[in-house]
């Protein structure tokens, strides 16, 4: 319809990780800019537990390659704290995110909102630690979680997401790729710069919290 009406617009959308190349190319021709995809996890068991439509990680990798061929950006979403998650599956998911290497990625712990299946599952399994909604966000408005999975505490899940962001975005290969894209595509330069500022702010926020804790910690002199 966009092509038929000759609309000159730029748009982004959510997408499954199995959109074929010919459709991706058509989406680009119609003004598509970015696909937001919920890859979520590298664990087949976890993907099955949360009823993801695309459980084949190889197919997802092929999708990202095809999106690049179509000159479309990919924003990857990864969620931890799902049923079946362990320290091993979290590590697998981070490695998977690096292998996929979407243009941008977000790592967040699961947010089990009341009225959702995730909330019901967490309540029935005992994974939900509190019903206090104030615990869902920290003082700066960043996501926390009220879910605990086995040996993984809610703080473990939050800490992993912070670690995942650092490992994903501070890779030399990623920084180089983003720099090249900014040079080749001036339209994306501002978005890349803005994203970098947000990342640095987040990293310094975490660093500041650690420094505060260090100053508050008792010393031998005390």
What are these regions, as identified by a protein language model?
Residues 2-186, 214-221:
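A structural motif corresponding to the C-terminal lobe/cap of the Radical SAM core domain
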Residues 192-222:
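Short linear elements at protein peripheries
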């Amino acid at each position: 319809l966009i092509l038929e009406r000759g609309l000159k617009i730029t748009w982004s959308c959510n997408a499954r990780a199995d959109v074929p190349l010919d459709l991706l190319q058509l989406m680009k021709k119609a003004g598509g800019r970015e696909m937001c995809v919920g890859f979520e996890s590298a664990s087949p068991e976890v993907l099955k537990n949360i009823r993801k439509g695309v459980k084949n990680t190889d197919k997802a990798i092929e999708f990202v390659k095809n999106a690049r061929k179509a000159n479309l950006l990919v924003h990857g979403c990864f969620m931890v704290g799902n049923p079946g998650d362990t320290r091993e599956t979290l590590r697998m998911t981070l490695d998977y995110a690096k292998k996929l290497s979407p243009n941008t990625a977000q790592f967040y712990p699961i947010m089990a909102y009341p009225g959702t299946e995730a909330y019901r599952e967490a309540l029935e399994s005992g994974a939900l630690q509190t019903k206090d909604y104030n615990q869902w966000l920290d003082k700066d408005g960043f996501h926390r979680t009220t879910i605990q999975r086995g040996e993984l505490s809610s703080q473990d899940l939050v800490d992993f997401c912070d670690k995942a962001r650092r490992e994903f975005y501070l890779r030399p290969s990623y920084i180089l790729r983003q720099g090249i894209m900014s040079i080749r595509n001036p339209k994306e330069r501002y978005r890349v710069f803005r994203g970098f500022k947000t990342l640095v702010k987040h990293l310094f926020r975490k660093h500041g919290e650690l420094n505060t804790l260090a100053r508050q910690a008792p010393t031998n002199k005390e």
